[in-house]
């Protein structure tokens, strides 16, 4: 991965540029300076900026980062029953449990990045762990994608995610209070669940 504070020239890449047709463009070069793409063209005419690292991709694909717009970093994708979720949260809502959840979310975020996903929009995670992981990534403690974190979601009684990655709001006033609390905790977006569990 190119460092954000130096220049990198990728050569001999097969570029997928993100355009509508996105036809593979073989034997291309891309210059990145301080994290910004500044030039793209045929490898034969590429000129490396002074001090740039040159990475020969031998025909490997190079493309813009992907964006995953719906992620529960805590989950494996397998269903969890509401009863199991409540029992699990009681076991995890302590310093050791919160550290375990943050570790799981960190691993999931890093797996997203390793898969080419450079931006993740969270869809609700337990114990505000996504906000903690986002803050650690932003502080440079470890690598990860740009994380747009909602904290926990807000759901209706008996709603999706209740007790695991969503707080139950029993009234509009309670929902408004939860939104204010999420904002105060650093949520980037608010995730609402309005369907049943």
State what each model feature region is.
Residues 7, 105-106, 110, 131, ...:
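Amphipathic, non-transmembrane alpha-helical secondary structure
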Residues 3-5, 120:
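Beta-strand-rich domain onsets/edges
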Residues 5-11:
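Extreme N-terminal starter segment of soluble prokaryotic enzymes
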Residues 61-136:
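Metal-associated gating/positioning segment near the N- to mid-region
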Residues 10, 53-55, 148:
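Hydrophobic/aromatic beta-strand patches that form the interior of the parallel beta-sheet core
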Residues 13, 30, 35, 59, ...:
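Divalent metal-coordination and catalytic microenvironments
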Residues 2-3, 15, 19-63:
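Histidine-rich, glycine-flanked metal-binding segment
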Residues 138-197:
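Metal-coordinating catalytic core of metallo-dependent amide/deamination hydrolases
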